[in-house]
């Protein structure tokens, strides 16, 4: 849970304690990872290993309006790149729904401009649909069978070195 200027969520929310369990729905098994979870490849991987057919990231992410344009671009590009990486590494489509618009700061600061750019990615990280910075309804078709094909040509889940990952359970490696 973030603790950044404008995102003081650590003071209001507690991390979940139910693990990473996909939700069975009429459209498939959804691995729902909310906001801050999207930055962690381990969360996406655990959802994929638990059988998620789609990763869904509902989020509200933006930038300080006073940031220079290069910094804004870096932040947005890193956000999209992380999603594309999760799609590729796990061989599943990724759906990211982000807020748009401006929220003023109650403290008198510049507030937050939410950058939108919601998107749907295929299992190879390719864009299937993408919104801009205005409120948008994205409608597209996703071929869930394609993930199986992608996982056969890129067997990243199969070829993991689980024997070598014990240190991932440590905060730091001594």
Each language-model region and where it sits:
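Generic low-polarity alpha-helical segments
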Residues: 1-3, 15-17, 69-77
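CN hydrolase (nitrilase-like) catalytic-core segments centered on the catalytic cysteine
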Residues: 38-138
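Short, flexible loop segments at the rims of nucleotide/cofactor-binding pockets, characterized by
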Residues: 8-12, 31-35, 70-74
């Amino acid at each position: 849970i973030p603790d950044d200027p404008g995102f003081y969520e650590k003071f209001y929310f507690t991390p979940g304690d139910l693990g990473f369990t996909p939700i069975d729905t009429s459209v498939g098994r959804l691995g729902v990872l909310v906001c801050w979870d999207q930055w962690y490849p381990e969360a996406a991987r655990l959802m994929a290993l638990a059988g998620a057919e789609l990763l869904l990231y509902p989020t509200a992410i933006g930038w300080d309006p006073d940031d220079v344009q290069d910094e804004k671009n870096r932040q947005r590009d890193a956000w999209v790149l992380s999603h594309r990486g999760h799609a590729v590494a796990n061989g599943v489509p990724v759906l990211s729904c982000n807020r748009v618009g401006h929220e003023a700061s109650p403290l008198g600061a510049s507030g937050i401009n939410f950058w939108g750019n919601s998107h749907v990615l295929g299992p190879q990280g390719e864009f299937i649909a993408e919104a801009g910075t205005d409120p948008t309804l994205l409608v597209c078709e996703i071929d869930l069978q394609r993930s199986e094909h992608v996982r056969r040509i890129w067997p990243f889940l199969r070829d993991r070195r689980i024997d070598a990952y014990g240190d991932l359970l440590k905060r730091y490696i001594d």
